[in-house]
């Protein structure tokens, strides 16, 4: 099986890059039956069965490479866990680095692993969307991903009809257009986190 997975948290602006890549990839292309698209979100260790089942694994994620925002880098095979753990931006990266290491320990690890990572611009805007430079990077990342999946026998074919909501691997009510259109104002919703879980003045 070929697995293409986007990881990250769409609630924290550019950290949602990986999930938005998978969302766009599925909206744009149909694939051969052996290709599995996964919205990995921040599930961490719960994703291990996808990794163990994959003969080839493609990962999309926002990665702090220390480069200009929007810069894409493609990392392969044994270097992938190192980059996921080098400059952790959130807990999901720690979790997915562990997923890869545990899959190796079980002896069920993909023959090939490729990470398409993008340098984020903004990570501290709760409820925010991708910045403009990241949206442009999604387009490039998706095409690079489709080319790779084609080489892996995934046979991407442009969709001739709109993807039905029930078929979406991402959460329909968090789809990019709707997410941006329905975001409440700063006055109505805190921009630095969920107020229900923030310390209150005594």
UniProtKB/Swiss-Prot annotation:
It holds the Pfam family HycI. It comes from the Bacteria. Keywords: Aspartyl protease, Hydrolase, Metal-binding, Nickel, Plasmid, Protease. Ni(2+) binds at residues 15, 61, 92. Disulfide bonds: none annotated. One of its GO terms (molecular function) is enzyme activator activity. Transmembrane segments: none annotated. One of its GO terms (biological process) is protein processing. InterPro entries: Pept_A31_hyd_express, Pept_HybD-like_dom_sf, Peptidase_A31. SUPFAM superfamilies: HybD-like. Belongs to the peptidase A31 family. Absolutely required for hydrogenase activity. Mediates the attachment of hydrogenase to the bacterial membrane; attachment is a requirement for enzymatic activity. This is Hydrogenase expression/formation protein HoxM. The lineage of its organism: Bacteria, Pseudomonadati, Pseudomonadota, Betaproteobacteria, Burkholderiales.
